[in-house]
Amino acid sequence: MRVGRIARIDTGRRARTGVPEVVLGEGKDDEHLVAILRALAEDGRGAVVSRPTRSQAQRLGGLARAATLPLESLAGGRVWWLRGMPDGDPPAGVVGLVTAGTADVPIAEEARAVLQSVGATTVEAYDVGVAGLHRVTRAARRLERSHPRVYLVFAGREGALPTVWAGLVRAPVVGVPTSVGYGRGGRGEAALNAMLQSCAPVAVVNIDAGVPAALFALHLLTGSSPDE
């Protein structure tokens, strides 16, 4: 779908890959973003808007309040959901979301919002970092009862939680380094490096990449059935 000279929207992404259309707000002109969303809405299609700027979020909020577009704010405004006609069944299986600290929760909630937009089921354990190992083991036992097919584990600072978590659970673990931390190795750098050097099997995405982590989890859910 073409939107003037500014965009070519992939309307077959969900059917082809199992993941929703995601429109990145960051770097786009506000009017261009709105034009893209209007075109999607007119065609009855949904989308996720990730990382809107402050002015974009204000604009989207105004459109939502006026009921001009079927928009919903998720994850504290870090993600917006343009609701459209159903274009597929909810993915089978559960995604576990785990954070080391409360400061990592906003990135985890970005991921949860993307998963929520397509009806995926999630279970969460927040603020269960390795500074209190009793919290980690207790949370792992609780979430394992839901039999997640993949875990997204978010951690800043030293980034140790994904490695520990991967040693406790059966499902694959995706480490998501967050930009929590300061000084040398801060802003997620030490966390990213630690996860890349994990001795336990952990896949790793970029710093603060909650949305890509969620999309990867959806690929795992839709790429095979739970019985395969």
Please tell me what each predicted stretch does.
Residues 90-135:
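Glycine-rich phosphate/diphosphate-binding loop of Rossmann-like nucleotide-binding domains
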Residues 70-74, 165-188, 204:
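Short, acidic/small-residue loops that bind anionic groups at enzyme active sites
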Residues 31-33, 104-109, 133-134, 155-165, ...:
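Short glycine/serine/threonine-rich phosphate/pyrophosphate-binding segments
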Residues 1-70:
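Long amphipathic alpha-helical segments
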Residues 99, 140-143, 180, 184-228:
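C-terminal binding/interaction regions
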Residues 138-178:
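Glycine-rich phosphate-binding loop
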Residues 79, 123-144, 189, 205:
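Glycine-rich oxoanion-binding loops at beta->alpha junctions
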